[in-house]
Amino acid sequence: MAAGYPNIDIAPFIDHALLTPTATPEQVDQWCEQADRYNFASVCLYPTYVKQAAEFLHGKKPKVCTVIGFPTGATTRSVKLYEALEAVENGATELDVVINLGCLKSGNTEAVHREIAEICEETGQVVKVILETNLLTDAEKKIAADIAMDAGATFLKTNTGWNGGATVADVKLLKDITRERVGIKASGGIRTLNQALDLILAGATRLGTSRGIDLIHQRDNPEKVE
C-alpha cells in the first residue's frame, strides 16, 4: 500500500473500463479475464460487447456494466431506454447513463428526471447516472444529483472521462449532497494508486478506470509508487 494511506483493497472498487473506440473482441476477453482474476467490481464496455462479456463472466463475480447515451447524453429519451433495455437483455446488470446536459442547463429538470426514472423502473438494474461534473457549476451538480436520486439512481458518477476527470473536490461535494443514500463512482483520469486512494477517502465507492491493472501493480509494488 502507498505510504501514508490506510490499508484499502482497491480491487473491489474498480469498474474495469474498456471504452476506447478501437476496442476489439480480443481486448474484451482480456478485460473480462483481468476483472475476474483481480476481483474487480465490474468490466465496463460499450453495448456492442455486452453479450460477449456476459458469456465470458457467466457464474463469475465481476458484473457486466455498459454505458448508455455515451458520451454526450444527447440522444433521445426513447433511444436511451431502448439501448438500456437491449443491454439488459444481452446480460448487463449495471448501466452508466449520461444525463441530458442541455435539458439540465436549460432548466428542463422534468425531462432529466423522466429519462432517468424510466430507465431505472423499466430495467430494474443498477443505474449509475453520469453527471459530467466538469461541465457543471456546483449549483447544477446539486440539482442533477437530487434529480438522479429522486429518479431512482443507485450511484452518481462524476464523469465520462471525455471532458476531464474526477476530482477529490467533486467527490466530497457529492458525498455531502447524497449523505450516503447512493453510491459515488469517480471516473476519468484515474492513473495512480494515490489518486485512487484519495478519491476513495473522499467518498468514492466505485472507481471507473482503464488503468485497473496499473493500480494493482502499484498496490503490489509500493516501493515504486511515487
UniProtKB/Swiss-Prot annotation:
GO CC annotation: what is one? Answer: cytoplasm
Q: Which residues form the active site?
A: D96 (proton donor/acceptor), K157 (schiff-base intermediate with acetaldehyde), K185 (proton donor/acceptor)
Q: Which reaction does it catalyse?
A: 2-deoxy-D-ribose 5-phosphate = D-glyceraldehyde 3-phosphate + acetaldehyde
User: Which InterPro entries would you find in this protein's record?
Assistant: Aldolase_TIM, DeoC, DeoC/FbaB/LacD_aldolase, DeoC_typeI
Q: Which domain of life is it from?
A: Bacteria
Q: Which GO terms describe its molecular function?
A: deoxyribose-phosphate aldolase activity
Chloroplast keyword on record: no
Q: Which EC class heads this enzyme's classification?
A: lyase
- Alphabetized UniProt keyword annotations: Cytoplasm, Lyase, Schiff base
- What EC number(s) does this enzyme carry? 4.1.2.4
Against Pfam families, the record matches this protein to:
DeoC (PF01791)
Q: Where are the transmembrane segments?
A: none
> Which locations, inside or outside the cell, does it occupy?
Cytoplasm
Keyword set includes Lyase: yes
Q: In which pathway does it act?
A: Carbohydrate degradation; 2-deoxy-D-ribose 1-phosphate degradation; D-glyceraldehyde 3-phosphate and acetaldehyde from 2-deoxy-alpha-D-ribose 1-phosphate: step 2/2
Swiss-Prot/TrEMBL GO biological process terms:
2-deoxyribose 1-phosphate catabolic process; carbohydrate catabolic process; deoxyribonucleotide catabolic process
PANTHER family according to UniProt: DEOXYRIBOSE-PHOSPHATE ALDOLASE (PTHR10889:SF1)
- HAMAP family per UniProt: DeoC_type1
What is the documented function of this protein? Catalyzes a reversible aldol reaction between acetaldehyde and D-glyceraldehyde 3-phosphate to generate 2-deoxy-D-ribose 5-phosphate.
Q: Which family does it belong to?
A: Belongs to the DeoC/FbaB aldolase family. DeoC type 1 subfamily.
The protein here is known as Deoxyribose-phosphate aldolase
Q: Which organism is it from?
A: Nostoc sp. (strain PCC 7120 / SAG 25.82 / UTEX 2576)
